[in-house]
Structure formats: C-alpha cells, structure tokens
Amino acid sequence: KDCWQVLWNMIKGLRDYDGVNLPSMQMDKHWDVDHMHWVGPFAIGHLKGLVEFQEYHQSRFLSFVPDRDGSTGINKIIFSDGNQAALMGHPSMSCTHKGNYFGFEPEGKQPRMFVMDFWTCDGERLVDNWCQIDMIDLFRSINKEYEEFIDGKLNYIK
C-alpha cells in the first residue's frame, strides 16, 4: 500500500474516537504496535510503541481537546511518495481546551494548532511519526506562557 492510504486509514480511525476508550480508534490496525516511534515537540519528546504513545501523549491530548476536528484547517499541505507521507495545517484543527494539559486548567479557549507531521510506513503499517507542533503559540493561544512550563511549574514529561 502507498503510505498515503495507510495514513488516511489511520486518520479515519482517529475520527472514530468514542470519547472514552482509546481502542475505539483501532490504532493497532494502523501502527506497528511494538516498534512505532513517535517523535513530538520539546514538551512531549520521543515515545516508542503504541502503549507508551497512548499513555504519555494521545490520552492526555484527547483529554485536552476532546472535540478536536482536523477537517477544518484552512491551509493544508498533503504529500506522499512511496513509504513516506506528510501533512501540515495552519491551523491544523479546530478544538476547545476542555481538559488539563501540561498543568494548564481548562478555560474553554480555542487553542491554535500549527502542526507538521511526517510519517514513514513499512508495508501496511505506520512506523514513524515526526510531529512538530508550535507549542509556544499553542500555549499563548490558551493565555499561558512557555516560561510557566520551562520554570518547572508544570510536569508533563514522564
């Protein structure tokens, strides 16, 4: 399969989230469960395997913006070549800050998400995702400052 088709199937799975159970998205169908690498921005870091990814990023992110909608990005760039694919959006999604994130309590604000994702596939599964998020702008969009995170007032990293 072309990496774009594998990626698109995974994105459709993200839309199946029932708001409670991560398995409702069936990510195990799309990722190499044991060997996947997810490399995120400074505040999250490198996660290996689906379990670690879901525990340290996906579950927290979904708590932060459970109503996320990635179909609303104004400017999207999508490309794929063989076993690689990329997706960028400015903004990448619309959402509402509804849960604690990096120690920031929800205030109902609409965070801005500028994201660039780069994926590698190994046949039928995604194996790598380099996910770059403008965290400084994300924090500012919910009226928080980067320094609050850096000063150690918040603890997110495992």
Regions found by a protein language model. Name each.
Residues 1-158:
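C-terminal and inter-domain tail/linker signature
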